[in-house]
Amino acid sequence: MQVLVRDNNVDQALRVLKKKMQREGVFREMKQRRSYEKPSERKTREKSEAIRRARKLARKQAIREGLLPAPPKKKLPERKPPLPQTAARPAG
């Protein structure tokens, strides 16, 4: 996996690399490979993941077709207005 470092900006390159690794599923695979997973456990996990994906897809399809209401959008907390600035005291 390659990431370009532009203008010696290593922080930005690291963020891009992390995002790429997340998309590829590298972190998930590393977590799974920490310990041995029996083939039967792997099969049940993969089956449950497939069921979860199918349910999610069906739910999105139903929302798109209007059979289910769309989930309510999360409300952002209201910002407080900034405090009024007081006049600077004269030195002396």
Curated annotation (Swiss-Prot):
UniProt similarity note: Belongs to the bacterial ribosomal protein bS21 family.
One GO biological process this protein is involved in is:
translation
Q: Name one GO molecular function term.
A: structural constituent of ribosome
Instruction: Quote the gene name from the UniProt entry.
Output: rpsU1
Kindly list the GO CC terms recorded for this protein: ribonucleoprotein complex; ribosome
- Regions of biased composition (Basic and acidic residues) lie at 25-52
Region (Disordered), start-end ranges = 25-92
Enumerate the InterPro entries for this protein. Answer: Ribosomal_bS21, Ribosomal_bS21_sf
Q: What is this protein called?
A: Small ribosomal subunit protein bS21A
- Keyword annotations of the record: Ribonucleoprotein, Ribosomal protein
Pfam families from the entry? Ribosomal_S21
Please give the superkingdom of this protein's source: Bacteria
